[in-house]
Amino acid sequence: MSQIENQWEQIKHIETGIMRHMLALGLDWNDEVAMARLARECKTFSAAHAQAVYASGDRTRKTRAELFAMVSIMIKTMEEAANENRDVHGGDVWKAFAKHLYS
């Protein structure tokens, strides 16, 4: 498998994880208000927040933390592809969320 095919597969896999976590949280990626709220929360989420979440044992908070980790991995994967002049992008779920993340 070529590098570009591997990056496409990674992005599809990450986006599937993001979608599953959104579904588990009862979030609709077509809901602009919910996606904007989620993006604001994601922008301020830190390693200290993650430690507190995992210490709490709260499954819903853990699911959110995992979602934010996947968002970070998605961004990193896309940055690596861009640095190699490769054109990769997420699908509908990623686009619905990312437009709020970057605004």
Task: Specify the residue positions occupied by each region the protein language model found.
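Amphipathic alpha-helical interaction modules
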Residues: G17-M74
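Short intrinsically disordered terminal tails
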Residues: M1-N6, H100-S103
